[in-house]
């Protein structure tokens, strides 16, 4: 064989097994004929390629040979080599001859431009599949859209995010830095340490600082005393009671706007509100929470939890702070917040609820609406677990509600601070 006629087959076989599938094969069921074999080499076939049932290797070989237009010669000068899985790389000329004899057609090979179009199409379909809603997600029904709209309207009417109507509230007796507590407050801190220890058990030591911004631009700060035995919260109790009562009234009005709530017997309305008001307020407060600073921005008022030993991370040991940070990380939308409030409100297992089955059906309706909203408005699969996370958060919120309420009741026994509305809501815990 002359040197110029020598056949160099390296370029045809070096990527044979790794050739990417650019032309999608026509898949063949193995029900009738059993295992399908390649018509060229006898290896396991994976579909029709260029008009013939072949394996991936022979498909790639034929495609490269035709596109490169290489002149192949049988190194054994016979042209009748047997092509099998083991021998298919030994004689490329006879392998190509076998491909053509089997019926593979050059005209069915896609051009480079067509290959690029196919590649782009495949990428686009994969992207659309990722962004598409999960199986079964059909979007929101008209009823679900109406439920969300009613909740959004109720939220807008009853949630004063700027606290513009929060007036005539009580402030700590000392509302500036570096000063001692008045004697009347100092005297109230002298009860038996063991009693106070029982009141504040299971709580993480922390201080609450308050900043009030005046309409004229002036700023007042309240910093609790330097000592950290837990009693520094006492001067703030009347003010915190006023803030809580203001939020409680907004939540109660929110419930009254919901038509399904108004249709319930008055006894069930009261029972549901007694059980859920605190939880719904926590959800509303979360929308105003800054995880980086641990601060709640409430219009002209700002509240900040401070670790007396320094460092914000330790505050995460407190269940309530940990909850707010965990919920904030979900980056929920307002629609999801109001649906969470509704799910919390319509809890059939609250003490005193009579029409439990009716309330249970309503809660399920709001839960399914939340699930449908997430499926049709959140990218899938990035948020495929968001609904489950939200339901887990609501379960955790029930536990926090019980813990915080019991602690407030213990404080109320020794340092009465609760408003009449708070006392009425707290009474539900005895059920």
UniProtKB/Swiss-Prot annotation:
Gene Ontology, cellular component aspect: intermediate filament cytoskeleton; nuclear body; nucleus; transcription regulator complex
Its biological purpose: Nuclear receptor that binds and is activated by a variety of endogenous and xenobiotic compounds. Transcription factor that activates the transcription of multiple genes involved in the metabolism and secretion of potentially harmful xenobiotics, endogenous compounds and drugs. Response to specific ligands is species-specific, due to differences in the ligand-binding domain. Activated by naturally occurring steroids, such as pregnenolone and progesterone. Binds to a response element in the promoters of the CYP3A4 and ABCB1/MDR1 genes.
Zinc finger (NR C4-type): 38-58, 74-99
Matches recorded under InterPro entries: NHR-like_dom_sf (IPR035500), Nucl_hrmn_rcpt_lig-bd (IPR000536), Nuclear_hormone_rcpt_NR1 (IPR050234), Nuclear_hrmn_rcpt (IPR001723), Znf_hrmn_rcpt (IPR001628), Znf_NHR/GATA (IPR013088)
Keywords noted in UniProt: Activator, DNA-binding, Metal-binding, Nucleus, Receptor, Transcription, Transcription regulation, Zinc, Zinc-finger
Assembly behavior: Heterodimer with RXRA. Interacts with NCOA1. Interacts (via domain NR LBD) with CRY1 and CRY2 in a ligand-dependent manner.
SUPFAM superfamilies assigned: Glucocorticoid receptor-like (DNA-binding domain), Nuclear receptor ligand-binding domain
Location in or out of the cell: Nucleus
DNA-binding region per Swiss-Prot/TrEMBL record: 38-104
Listed PANTHER family: NUCLEAR HORMONE RECEPTOR (PTHR24082), NUCLEAR RECEPTOR SUBFAMILY 1 GROUP I MEMBER 2 (PTHR24082:SF39)
Pfam families to which the protein is assigned, alphabetical: Hormone_recep, zf-C4
Tagged with keyword Nucleus: yes
Predominant location: nucleus
Disulfide bonds: none
Short motif (Bipartite nuclear localization signal): ranges: 63-89
Domain NR LBD: 143-430
Residues binding hyperforin: 244, 282-285
GO terms, molecular function: DNA-binding transcription activator activity, RNA polymerase II-specific; nuclear receptor activity; nuclear receptor binding; RNA polymerase II cis-regulatory region sequence-specific DNA binding; RNA polymerase II transcription regulatory region sequence-specific DNA binding; sequence-specific double-stranded DNA binding; zinc ion binding
A Gene Ontology BP annotation from the UniProt entry: cellular response to molecule of bacterial origin
The gene coding this protein: Nr1i2
Family according to the record: Belongs to the nuclear hormone receptor family. NR1 subfamily.
Official protein name in the record: Nuclear receptor subfamily 1 group I member 2
Source organism, top-level taxon: Eukaryota
């Amino acid at each position: 064989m002359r040197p110029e006629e020598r056949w160099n087959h390296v370029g045809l076989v070096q990527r044979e097994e790794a050739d990417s599938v650019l032309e999608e094969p026509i898949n063949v069921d193995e029900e009738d004929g059993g295992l399908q074999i390649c018509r060229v080499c006898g290896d396991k076939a994976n579909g029709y390629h260029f008009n013939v049932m072949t394996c991936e290797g022979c498909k790639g070989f034929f495609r490269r040979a035709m596109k490169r237009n290489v002149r192949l010669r049988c190194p054994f000068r016979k042209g009748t080599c047997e092509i099998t899985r083991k021998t298919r790389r030994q004689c490329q000329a006879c392998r190509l001859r076998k491909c053509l004899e089997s019926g593979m057609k050059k005209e069915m090979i896609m051009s480079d431009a067509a290959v690029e179009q196919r590649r782009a199409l495949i990428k686009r379909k994969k992207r659309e599949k990722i962004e598409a809603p999960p199986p079964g997600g059909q979007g929101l029904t008209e009823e679900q859209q109406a439920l969300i709209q009613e909740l959004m309207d109720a939220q807008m009417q009853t949630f004063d995010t700027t606290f513009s109507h929060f007036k005539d509230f009580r402030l700590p007796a000392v509302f500036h830095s570096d000063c001692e507590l008045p004697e009347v407050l100092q005297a109230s801190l002298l009860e038996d340490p063991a009693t106070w220890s029982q009141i504040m058990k299971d709580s993480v030591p922390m201080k609450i600082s308050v900043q009030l911004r005046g309409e004229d631009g002036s700023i007042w700060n309240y910093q609790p005393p330097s000592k950290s035995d837990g009693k520094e919260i006492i001067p703030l109790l009347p003010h915190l009671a006023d803030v809580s009562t203001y939020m409680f009234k907004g939540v109660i009005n929110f419930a009254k706007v919901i038509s399904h709530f108004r249709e319930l017997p008055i006894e069930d309305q009261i029972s549901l509100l007694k059980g859920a008001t605190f939880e719904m307020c926590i959800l509303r407060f979360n929308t105003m929470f800054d995880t980086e600073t641990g601060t709640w921005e409430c219009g002209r008022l700002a509240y900040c939890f401070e670790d007396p030993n320094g460092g914000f991370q330790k505050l995460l040991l407190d269940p309530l702070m940990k909850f707010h940070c965990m919920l904030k990380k979900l980056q929920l939308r307002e629609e999801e917040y109001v649906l969470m409030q509704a799910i919390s409100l319509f809890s059939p297992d609250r003490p005193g609820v009579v029409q439990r089955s009716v309330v249970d059906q309503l809660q399920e309706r709001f839960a399914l609406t939340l699930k449908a909203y997430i499926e049709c408005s959140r990218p899938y699969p990035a948020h495929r677990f968001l609904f489950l996370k939200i339901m887990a958060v609501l379960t955790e919120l029930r536990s926090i509600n019980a813990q915080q309420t019991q602690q407030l009741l213990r404080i109320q026994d020794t340092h009465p601070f609760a408003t009449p509305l708070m006392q009425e809501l707290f009474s539900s815990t005895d059920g």
